[in-house]
């Protein structure tokens, strides 16, 4: 398979088999579908019957969406090296489509870090058991006026109370009310079922008063903008969340930055 010298002489037979399978999938499935989607409009790329979903279903059936998740939760339990090799091959096939599957698991993989078993059972286990791509995630971090400023904890503005996030979570009794907007370039937003959402909880602390939640996107009050037309990487659908006004019973996973 490889056309280069393999400098890692310690790969096991399992490692090599996983890499070979991922390479074949990238060549035979990902590349042709990536070319097809690149020629489609943004709206058609995420419409019912799009080859995007055929690709996702095949990727899910091979377990690539859960490669890094431990077996105890239903994942493949791949080692870090195996996970790296799988993604290297998939991204070789097509950057956009590989990112689709990678981001599909982002909220669920990150949720494992919370250690909350109730939430893991509610969100992670069903995702791992899914083999038809009917459950997928995205990461709603960027905002129209801020980009991904909420990640820049080392910058002076991070603690500036004048810097207001565009998606706010306000505590009312035992519930949080989410109100605001995310950017028009949230990858996988047009079709994701859940989002890992970065938002602002305490505006008096600036971006430092932020947190994270896992948001089911079928809740009343969640609106999505139109799919984004792009010059390049058209095989990675992007879109917008706007006007989120949702009485959310709990903010499942929050922490002060």
Where are these regions (language model features)?
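Flexible, small-/acidic-enriched active-site or ligand-binding loops
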Residues: 218-252
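Short Gly/Pro-enriched turn/cap motifs at secondary-structure boundaries
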Residues: 156-160, 186-187, 203-204, 229-235
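A gly/ser-rich beta-alpha-beta helix-loop segment of oxidoreductase catalytic cores
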Residues: 135-170
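Core alpha/beta catalytic barrel or barrel-like domain that forms the active/cofactor pocket
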Residues: 34, 97-104, 136-143
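N-terminal glycine-rich flavin-associated loop
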Residues: 98-120, 150
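A short core secondary-structure module
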Residues: 175, 179-223
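Short Ser/Thr-interspersed hydrophobic loop/turn segments at strand-loop and sheet-helix junctions
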Residues: 63, 86-91, 215-219, 243-247
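Amphipathic, small/basic residue-rich leader segments at the start of a protein or domain
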Residues: 1-101, 122-130
């Amino acid at each position: 398979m490889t056309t280069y010298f393999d400098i890692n002489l310690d790969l096991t037979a399992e490692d090599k088999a996983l890499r070979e399978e991922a390479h074949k999938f990238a060549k035979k499935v990902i590349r042709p579908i990536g070319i097809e989607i690149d020629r489609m409009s943004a709206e058609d790329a995420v419409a019912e019957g799009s080859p995007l979903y055929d690709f996702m279903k095949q990727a899910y059936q091979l377990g690539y969406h859960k490669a890094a998740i431990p077996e105890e939760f239903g994942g493949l339990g791949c080692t870090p090296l195996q996970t790296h090799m799988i993604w290297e091959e998939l991204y070789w096939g097509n950057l956009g489509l590989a990112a689709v599957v990678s981001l599909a698991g982002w909220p669920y993989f990150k949720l494992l870090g919370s250690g909350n078993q109730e939430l893991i059972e509610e969100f992670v286990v069903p995702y791992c058991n899914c083999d038809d791509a009917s459950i997928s995630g995205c990461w709603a971090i960027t905002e129209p006026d801020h980009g991904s400023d909420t990640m820049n904890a080392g910058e002076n503005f991070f603690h500036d109370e004048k810097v207001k996030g565009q998606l706010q979570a306000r505590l009312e009794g035992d519930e949080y009310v989410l109100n605001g907007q995310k950017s028009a370039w949230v990858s996988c937003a047009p079709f994701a079922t859940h989002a890992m959402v970065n938002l602002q909880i305490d505006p008096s602390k600036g971006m430092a008063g932020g947190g994270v939640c896992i948001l089911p996107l079928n809740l009343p009050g969640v609106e999505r903008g139109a799919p984004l037309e792009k010059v390049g990487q058209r095989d990675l659908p992007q879109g917008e969340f706007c006007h989120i006004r949702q009485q959310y019973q709990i903010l499942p996973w929050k922490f002060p930055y």
